């Protein structure tokens, strides 16, 4: 395929996108400063409960509250606004909630990655290079809403503490003037770093571009060069101009060529296009599609990588062998969830074949059953593992995001590997480095929780926690409980307050003393007609906040529990984000919650058992979590980086 493109820049194309929101940026900055002052004054005072009236409302005037706008779709990407609030819905009545600076300041996380301010979305091009983990991300330098997208850049020694570097790539060429969109990194055997990314042209056509470091001797990779003959790929015949995006990390074929896949759709069928290259400048499109699944719509942020069937270690993207399965993951534009399938990769036929066609990509398994999208993995050659990043969006109003001056966080990086016990799903678990933030711990063994009981867990504070817990149902109750053919689904179940014979039971996180606000993370067990137990793992946001301009959903799915296993979970609580992992990471749920009372020193932790027919025995260990050091990089630090 030729390097030159039929798309040329408009003669009078404007490159002033970065100045469109100067007034918004100024407004956001002033509010952020006010938030910091209010927060400092608040935490300086001892308090047992949060006083929602301690700071005057900044969002109480409904007449001045702007309407939530659709963002992203007209430009050719998935909806970036809260679709529930976009439709005009409010949870409850009475207009928007009177948020104040105390509440909004509390929402900012302490150990999840996020920029100092403004909007962030997809993780891009993560890699490990010369002693540093690099993380790039979709970023709006001009405001707390989607738009004016460039690449932010940060580096870390341990995936926990981060230094913000200058922007890696900005929208300064005709082929990316409407956005430097998502891309992936490939490290070649000679050490060269290749970055392929999607650019939105001056005519909103999606094209693929090549960039590379200006100085490979710089471990921070601060400066990047865009290939002078970009774009290297344009939409092929039969693919619409706005349906061609997000190139993957390349993998090496047995012929010595590099292969990538790019997400698209043909009518309503999601597809993964395949290209081969030897130099990342010219490409050969393969006739076969890597995969295609009818009815799944546009595929964004495709990821493709091997996992070992024997070893616990991660594998380089180019690794092949008999004892390997391949993972294909897509982000569905239609519902904004990340789906994956396990299967076999046939290099000669250029085909991924799912192990279970009924659970092919976009149909069955998901990385995460909460708010988790546009994820991307990379092979960490330092620790021989595959690491997963995911974008955690907001579920509050856009107006509240503008008021607090930022929107979105990234998940805690997760190790991804095949579940050797089931062979049919992945395991995801926070990287071990997050445990370096653990402080004081409290341990509770064999706590008996009776049906209908709520038990306070006596810990110091409950805003930044790492919780590990196990639960057991009484064996006698299991034997007596009647069999049922009723299937349980978390999102239509009625939540943690709806009682059944063997559930729900678990933990209330971010709860206040009076339980006017709480977020349950729980198990629900059903005894099937064959006598087998079917377990669901859920997270219920319906009572997480008194605010009515927040989308409060119930998330979750089934979780495999093997014979002899106790029910186990791990929860990371970090202010407004709750990441939950069941059975070693077989099922994961990420939630965004926005309490108005259960904040700062007023946040509590409870055990609960809403089962009707069984006692539950719980054992748990709870760590207070330190804050990560996430701060700007200063040039004086450069001499310390080699």
Swiss-Prot record:
One of its GO terms (biological process) is sucrose metabolic process. Keywords: Disulfide bond, Glycoprotein, Glycosidase, Hydrolase, Membrane, Signal-anchor, Transmembrane, Transmembrane helix, Vacuole, Zymogen. Pathway: Glycan biosynthesis; sucrose metabolism. It is found in: Membrane; Vacuole; Vacuole lumen. It is an enzyme of class 3 (hydrolase). Residues 1-22 are cytoplasmic. Its main location: membrane. Substrate binds at residues 119-122, 138, 146, 181-182, 245-246, 300, 333. It comes from the Eukaryota. The active site is at residue 122. It is a single-pass type II membrane protein. Glycans are attached at residues 100, 267, 491, 615. It catalyses: Hydrolysis of terminal non-reducing beta-D-fructofuranoside residues in beta-D-fructofuranosides. GO terms for cellular component: membrane; vacuolar lumen. Residues 44-642 are lumenal. The chain crosses the membrane at residues 23-43. GO terms for molecular function: beta-fructofuranosidase activity. SUPFAM superfamilies: Arabinanase/levansucrase/invertase (SSF75005), Concanavalin A-like lectins/glucanases (SSF49899). Its EC number is 3.2.1.26. Residues 1-95 form a propeptide. Pfam families: Glyco_hydro_32C (PF08244), Glyco_hydro_32N (PF00251), INV_N (PF11837). Disulfide bonds join 490-538. May be present in two forms, a 70 kDa monomer and a heterodimer of the 30 kDa and 38 kDa subunits. The ratio of the levels of the two forms within cells appears to be regulated developmentally. Belongs to the glycosyl hydrolase 32 family. This is Acid beta-fructofuranosidase. It comes from Vicia faba (Broad bean).
